[in-house]
């Protein structure tokens, strides 16, 4: 191997492996806990052991998943319920490291949102909330406890939790749209496009709903949210989405508390900002990790534990069935804590998709319009393709004919200021 090839192989190895050599992973679980309160609505009949039974089932789920971030809906809006989960479920059997964020309930009501976190990995920084006609939208800014923390260098992630208005009437859809519009306006007012995670029970029936479009097609592309599994459609009662439905775990309900009808809705979501989706500020969503716990694709209009679940143990399937009519949604995040943030922050957002049918697709998120030069290199350092193109501010998708053999390639993208982003592409 000549010197040039050795150099390029070394560069390629650094590009591909360096951000992950010492990467940590944060596992998030989002869960609508279904009335974790004694203030249940009329028609829901509970026994004196109601919360004790819920604690037993939730503890099984927590021990099985072991989340670092646990965001919840439908927790009682008093601190006693927040403390109860922390003390009776999370910090048990020798575990002492779970903490909770501040509770708010300025919108009023008997249920609220909450975020619990593993204090060995994360610390609480600050929070804000948005009042709505239904429930607060809660945002908690967390910092990752990097080895460089004492020198003031860390990674921030803001976890935003909501429980949007339920119902299928036009008025319900309008309220949901108002809620998500309020969030996007708030983020724009803050003025920092950053690492945001937005999760909760969205109560959406379709990706065409205005509430959802407010998130994924917001006018300022730097604040848009991305669905890690990119599954748009009419989710309600559609068998083609059976593997992502999150509600209901029950087909019938003897006590009147659980929604019925079986698994036929995608109500529960974890969405991420472009900075997390593209991994540009040291945090990247591991999109293939996204799943609803217990959703093996065989639950359409059925129950989570009958017939036997193929993705989780029977004990966990039964705990999910007994605890809530929703399934928890799980997503992992890769944290690059190798060097200081400034060293590896990319000057502009780029996502390179592996070539399909001799076409290379590149997606840009740009703060300013400019001319960009795209170059494709082989592993031995030979430039194979070069193309120049002018892109406007915002989101752009560029497709380049890619009639090259199956191999690994290095993609170099540079603007007129000589700011450069280097990616890899694999053609199979």
Predicted feature descriptions by range:
Residues 24-337:
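Divalent cation-coordinating acidic motifs and surrounding scaffolds
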Residues 335-356, 365-367, 382-384:
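Residue-level detector of functionally pivotal "anchor" positions at catalytic/ligand-binding pockets or at interdomain
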Residues 74, 82, 131, 354, ...:
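Non-cytosolic beta-sheet module surface loops
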Residues 391-393, 404-428:
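C-terminal tail/sorting-segment detector
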């Amino acid at each position: 191997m000549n010197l040039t090839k050795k150099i390029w192989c070394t560069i390629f190895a650094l590009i591909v492996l360096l951000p992950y050599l010492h990467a940590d992973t944060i596992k998030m679980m989002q869960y609508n806990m279904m009335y974790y309160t004694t203030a249940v609505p009329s028609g829901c009949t509970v026994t004196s052991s109601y919360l004790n039974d819920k604690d037993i089932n939730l503890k099984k789920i927590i021990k099985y998943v072991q989340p670092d971030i646990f965001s919840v809906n439908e927790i009682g809006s008093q601190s006693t319920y927040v403390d109860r989960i922390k003390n009776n479920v999370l910090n048990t059997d020798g575990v002492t490291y779970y903490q909770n964020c501040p509770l708010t309930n300025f919108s009023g009501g008997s249920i609220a949102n909450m975020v619990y976190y593993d204090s060995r990995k994360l610390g609480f920084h600050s929070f804000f909330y948005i009042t709505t006609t239904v429930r607060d939208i809660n945002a908690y800014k967390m910092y990752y406890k990097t080895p460089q923390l004492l020198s003031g260098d860390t990674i921030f992630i803001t976890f935003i939790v909501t429980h949007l208005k339920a119902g299928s009437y036009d008025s319900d859809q309008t309220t949901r749209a108002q809620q998500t519009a309020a969030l996007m306006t708030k983020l724009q007012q803050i003025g920092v496009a950053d690492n945001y995670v937005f999760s909760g029970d969205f109560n959406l029936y379709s990706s065409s709903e205005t509430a959802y479009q407010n998130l994924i097609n917001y006018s300022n592309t730097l604040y848009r949210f991305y669905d890690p599994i990119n599954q748009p459609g009419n989710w309600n009662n559609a068998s083609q989405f059976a593997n992502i439905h999150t509600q209901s775990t029950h087909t019938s309900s003897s006590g009147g508390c659980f929604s019925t009808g079986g698994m036929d809705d995608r109500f529960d979501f974890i969405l991420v900002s472009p900075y997390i989706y593209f991994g540009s500020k040291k945090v990247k969503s591991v999109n293939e990790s996204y799943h609803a716990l217990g959703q093996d694709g065989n639950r359409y209009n059925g129950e989570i534990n009958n017939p036997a679940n193929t993705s989780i143990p029977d004990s966990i399937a039964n705990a999910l069935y007994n605890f809530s009519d929703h399934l928890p949604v799980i997503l992992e995040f890769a944290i690059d804590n190798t060097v200081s943030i400034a060293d590896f922050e990319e000057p502009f957002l780029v996502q390179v998709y592996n070539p399909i049918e001799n076409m290379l697709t590149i997606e840009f998120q740009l703060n300013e319009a400019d001319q960009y030069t795209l170059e494709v290199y082989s592993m031995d350092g030979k430039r194979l393709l070069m193309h120049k193109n002018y892109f406007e501010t915002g989101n752009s998708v560029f497709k380049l004919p890619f009639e090259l053999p199956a191999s690994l390639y290095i993609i170099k993208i540079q603007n007129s200021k000589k700011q450069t982003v280097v990616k890899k592409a694999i053609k199979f």
